[in-house]
Amino acid sequence: MRETDLFEPAKKSVNVVLVGITVLCFFTMQVWEKSMTNGNFNGHTTQFLLEHGALYAPAIREGEWYRLLTHIFLHGDILHLGNNMLILFCLGNALEHYLGKISYVGIYFFSGILAGLGSVVYNTDNTVSVGASGAVFGIIGAMLWLVLRNKGKLKGFTGPRMLLFVFMSVYAGFTDRGIDNAAHIAGLIAGFLLAMVIYRRSEDETEVVS
């Protein structure tokens, strides 16, 4: 297999489906909000997100647990969506290749839900949070474990590159306001730990890459 193949979607890729559904949700809700408020297409208002599945601790304590899942498909604006989907498309295709569809989907949603719990526990009551970032950080954490498990040598990845990517991803969250770092870190840890449980290294996966 060529190294670049890892980043190309496989036939019937579940990762591509996840990206497609998330993008479709964003633009569908943009049209919906515009039809209700006569607003623009620059993004969603906080109130609209709150009313349609965003993370919000008081609501979850009142039994609206579905928000731990629905927030994954919501994004504040097109830049927020684009950043998450770009990383998901690139790393997700590779992780799906190594783990298979079922394990990949499990890590994605498990990490997203645990990221939501981390956000709710850490943040104040008035915090409204949305985005696939926690689930995406779970994918990053899982890929980190795969690279480490293969002694830093995996087709398409190396230990130093992956560690630098993780560091820069976490660091970026602390350089800007309005970033849910609790969700990012919780998702990263969840993905890493779940990958430790389910991943079994095969002999043909290790390969020195430049």
Regions picked out by a protein language model, each given a short descriptive name:
Residues M1-S210:
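A detector for small-residue-rich transmembrane helices and their helix-helix packing motifs
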